[in-house]
Amino acid sequence: PKDLMLEVVRLLDKTENYTLLLFGAPNEIDALNFFSSAQKNTHNLAGKLTFAEELQLISSLDLMLSMDSGNAHLAANFGVETVTLWGVTHPYAGFAPFCQSMENALLSDRVRYPQIPTSVFGKTVPKGYEDCMRTIEPQLIVDRINMVLDIIQ
């Protein structure tokens, strides 16, 4: 959810320990400006890089935070530590980023949402599951990022 991801960005940005880079397509510029506009260390790169430039930058990251998306897989293939957020899908369905620790896969609450995974591809969202990602607390995400970065530095 947008409000919870904004809280993650704020928590990470205010430490001034990190530079946050937001990746996206040109049609996502406005959506990503929502996260970066009031933050000192957060930069919206949507629409500013060629694909080759984006790959080069991803390959040099210390960590990639991503939903279950293509960027998680790209980063993992470059050996970048990847923390992923999972809604109605589950990494055991076969879409976990390559060679990443399961501890870096932050899952929606499967007790509260026992039908997860609702489909292999996440296309099916049962009634009442629309907010399942709200069970992944912003502080949990920040704590995991801090733990991973502390381990690799």
Predicted regions: what they are:
Residues 1-2, 137:
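General structural signal for secondary-structure boundaries
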Residues 2-88:
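Donor-binding and catalytic core of enzymes assembling or modifying cell-surface/extracellular glycoconjugates
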Residues 44-45, 76-152:
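Nucleotide-sugar donor-binding patch of glycosyltransferase catalytic domains
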